[in-house]
Amino acid sequence: MRPLYLFVWWCLSYSLRLFYRRIKLVNPPKSFFGRTIYVSNHAASFMDPLVVACFRKPIVFFMTRSDVFTPLSRPLLWSVHMLPIYRQLDGVNTKEKNAEVFQECSKVLKGNRNLLIFGEGFTDDVFVRRLKPIKKGAVRIGFSALEYMNWSEKVYIAGVGCNYTEPNRMRSDLLISTSESICLNDYRSDYETNPNKVISELTIRVEKFIQSQITHVANPHLTELHEEIMILTRKGMNSICFDDKIDLTSRFR
């Protein structure tokens, strides 16, 4: 763990506890290390990596959009465990650029550290309670790391769900839920036979894992209706109208 990462982690752990009224962790990981790729929803832009890193034990390296990395910012971002990820919408040769990034990710996992990836690839301008389709990059990185290590160590992948009543409202509530993990080593023979098929199937499985960890409104046209129903019934994760007697774990379900 780099000193600046530790300092920022310590400061934010306290300040975010002041910002949020209640913070609930469901199935939190118990170890700082573990070679696990955590794939999270990306509901609240800048807030998501802060709460996932600060309120859960694992030491993580963040996959961050590449356009924030400049010759001046790169050393600072690296010191707080941030790695660039190149997307097609960034207008660069993603395959060539990401090959270098995958190599760095493999070194991170080989060092018994963890990765945090926001699998949707981007966040909505307006906070909505739904999961967009998950990209295949997280699973690709996992198998790339296993090949880098000659399959000598175990690499896991798990889903993380960030559930906010309202991410930017002070003294609102937050629940972070973690799914069971998948050991990618178990799929070695299938991967070596048909890698694309295995990557696609596991990506779908991880997507379902994340959906089960959040309040997921599958139809985007029903998100406003869902919010209105929560207000009327005083159930769910609405930040204003809710029954305080209902446990936060029950509300996000």
Where are these regions (language model features)?
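Soluble catalytic domains of membrane acyltransferases
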Residues: L4-T193
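Long, charge-rich alpha-helical interaction segments
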Residues: T193-R253
